[in-house]
Amino acid sequence: MATVLSGTSGALYYSPAGTTATFGESAVDVANDEIDIATYLNLKVSDPVKFSVVNTETGAAGTGTLPAGITAGTTYYVIGYTASTGVLQVSATLGGSTITITDDGTAVSPNAFQVEYAAPAAVGSVRDWSFEITRSEIDVTTIGQALGQYAPFRSYITGFADGSGSATVYTTDDDTNLSNRMVEDVLQRQQVGATMKLYIDRVVSGGSVDDTLSRSITVPVILTSASLNVNPDDGQSVAINFRPSEAPTFDLTKS
């Protein structure tokens, strides 16, 4: 007999807004071991990032060679990013020195290099989350129908899908909590990279989440509001509202 899950089986993971960008060969500064990516992003020191080659027309994996000194799939850590210029420096270790770049790589259009937040990370002290998806319909009922005994039904075609979500997170004295980042991200103009991973049933094995046994919904989002609640009768909390920016990906089977 199936067992009903409790809310404590769930969890909320998040990739911050403004942490994804594409760049070309000319953006790689070999002399200074820097990369000139987009300006006014939201990359912070110690953010874990990964590099890849993507096809900018399809969004899928592209063809090309990353700059020498950077390995696809390897986690690097931001040691410097200047929003006004877009200059990025990364290290192979947390708090380490900048990597050495010896060649600017190869990426011919429509291919480009991409840097993105390594993976959604756990948001601590989450009270709850909710996510609703809807589908609209367009009324295409026509006149001139033959009338019979029963009232005729309307006819519809598929419209657009949409959704909305929210999460309530308790405020703690830990400045590194991603919930603080989420509040700031609401006002981030470029929210590319913001992603919620909504676990319905999170299974941990060996100290790490086992996604093959867990069930989750991954959805790129736009954060629309943050409402802070401070009063003497309750734990301090912040309510974050969001909407999908792309279609969600459902992983609702344990396999």
PLM region spans:
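Extracellular Ig-like/FN3 beta-sandwich strand-entry sites
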Residues: 73, 162, 191-195
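Autoprocessing Asn-cyclization modules and mimics
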Residues: 4-7, 14-89, 94-97
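Short, acidic/charged, Gly/Pro-enriched secondary-structure junctions
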Residues: 13, 176-220
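Generic short beta-strand segments
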Residues: 49-56, 168-172, 199-203, 224
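Residues on the solvent-exposed faces and adjacent turns
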Residues: 53, 80, 92, 221, ...
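Solvent-exposed edge beta-strands and adjacent loop segments
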Residues: 2-27, 114-174, 214-241, 248
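Intrinsically disordered, low-complexity, charged/polar segments
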Residues: 92-120
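Surface-exposed ligand/attachment interfaces on beta-rich extracellular proteins
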Residues: 26-40, 58-71, 101-107, 120-124, ...
